[in-house]
Regions:
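Oxyanion-hole/transition-state-stabilizing segment in secreted/luminal serine hydrolases
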Residues: 205, 222-258, 263, 278-285
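A short helix->loop->beta-strand "cap" motif at the edges of active sites that frequently abuts
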Residues: 268-273
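Sec-dependent N-terminal signal peptides
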Residues: 6-15
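Substrate-gating cap/lid alpha-helix
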Residues: 281-319, 362
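Serine-esterase "nucleophile elbow" of acetyl-processing enzymes
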Residues: 139-141, 145-222, 226-236
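Histidine-centered active-site loop/cap adjacent to the catalytic His
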Residues: 332-362
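N-terminal secretory targeting modules
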Residues: 11, 19-180, 353-362
Length: 362
């Protein structure tokens, strides 16, 4: 055996031992055995699915995949481990040019610090090694911490295991979040173009306000379909928020809005239904065809909602904004980046809280 081959074998042996040690270093707990929050339907055969697609029918193939993604779901737990690792078994995985892999197939960890949720780490597996163990935070002080781990927004998972150091403890953390506020929306609500799972506008609002938002964001597919209405009708919620005017065209808004409201109100007659105007898309700066289409649907939404707020009780319409003065918060001309979603959350926070307060939601 020549020297080159011997060095290669030695290097592979050391690497293999290192990887084996890294795996053995942690004791793993299935995330669903801890406190899984953010689910619009509490019970699903796969705990990481948002909707039971065996029960609810009518979805397109793409919609079926989307509602099986854990967008908006988070795991609450306590641990005194100095290091936290994650091991995942994926179902289908998505790819995107405008959304970070950490967002669509990775994890985002927050730790409570002086009463506030503070970012602690984010990471994703490599595409070639989806089942590898990743370390999301390391070298902490070993004091007990309250943790919130956001799950991937756009990849199905069958198992999520959280690893802590041998000898460390991990346990269920009671949720500090109040109420159950469902939010049905487009790719914006889903979190498209975010850098990590905790940066969609519902998740930012949730951390700021302490109110629990239950995301049913479905990229490109929030068009007030009756079968999505069935899902919302069966949800245990104190309020519903809608980003319903981003995907449908003007004619679809005109045809579907009132029947959709009536469908939801049959099941939830006494809760607030809060509809958001869609945001302005920066693509419209020079794309005249898109500008015309976007203006038409915004005008139709405003017209129909003016009538809806008079026609139906407990129906509201609020404005949104995801752009700064320079109009440079978009990633691709349609979807905001993290900062744009922060602006969106800030733009609706006060009117949303004012409405919710009327119903004892605070």
């Amino acid at each position: 055996m020549n020297m080159k081959k011997a060095l290669i074998i030695l290097a592979l042996t050391v690497l293999s031992a290192s990887l084996s040690a890294q795996t053995k270093k942690y004791v793993f707990t299935e995330a669903s055995e801890l406190n899984l929050i953010g689910k619009i339907h509490k019970e699903t055969p796969n705990p990481y699915h948002r909707v039971d697609t065996m029960k609810y029918k009518g979805f397109t193939k793409g919609e079926n995949c989307q509602v099986r993604c854990p967008a908006g779901l988070a795991v609450l737990f306590k641990t005194n481990s100095k290091n936290i690792a994650i091991k995942t078994e994926y179902g289908w995985q998505w790819e995107s040019l405008a959304t970070m892999p950490i967002a669509y197939r990775g994890y985002d960890l927050y730790i409570k610090d002086k009463g506030e949720w503070r970012w602690a780490g984010s990471k994703a597996t490599s595409r070639k090694k989806p089942n590898e163990t990743i370390v999301i935070v390391k070298d902490m002080d070993g004091e007990e911490k309250e943790c919130m781990l956001y799950l991937p927004i756009y990849s199905e998972v069958h198992s999520v295991k959280i690893g802590v150091d041998k000898g460390a403890e991990i346990s269920y953390l009671e949720s500090p979040f109040r109420h159950r506020i469902g939010i049905f929306g487009s790719s914006y609500t889903h979190g498209y173009s975010t850098s990590r799972p905790g940066m969609s506008y519902p998740m930012q609002l949730m951390r700021w306000t302490g109110l629990q938002f239950l995301s049913l964001g479905c990229s490109g597919n929030c068009k007030m379909q009756p079968y999505f209405g069935e899902v919302l009708c069966d949800a245990e919620v104190d309020a519903l928020v809608f980003d319903s005017f981003s995907n449908p065209n003007a004619e679809m808004i005109k045809e579907r809005l009132f029947p959709f409201i009536e469908q939801i109100q049959k099941a939830h007659p006494d809760i607030p239904l809060i509809f958001q105007q869609t945001i302005s898309r920066e693509r419209c700066n020079f794309d005249l065809k898109t500008r015309e289409m976007e203006e038409a649907k915004k005008e139709m939404a405003a017209k129909m909602m003016k009538e809806a707020c008079k026609k139906y009780k407990n129906v509201y319409f609020i404005q949104t904004n995801a752009a700064d003065a320079l109009e440079e918060t978009s990633v691709d001309g349609t979807h905001p980046g993290d900062y744009g979603y922060t602006l969106w959350a800030k733009s609706i926070e006060k009117p949303l809280l004012k409405i919710l307060k009327k119903y004892g939601i605070k």
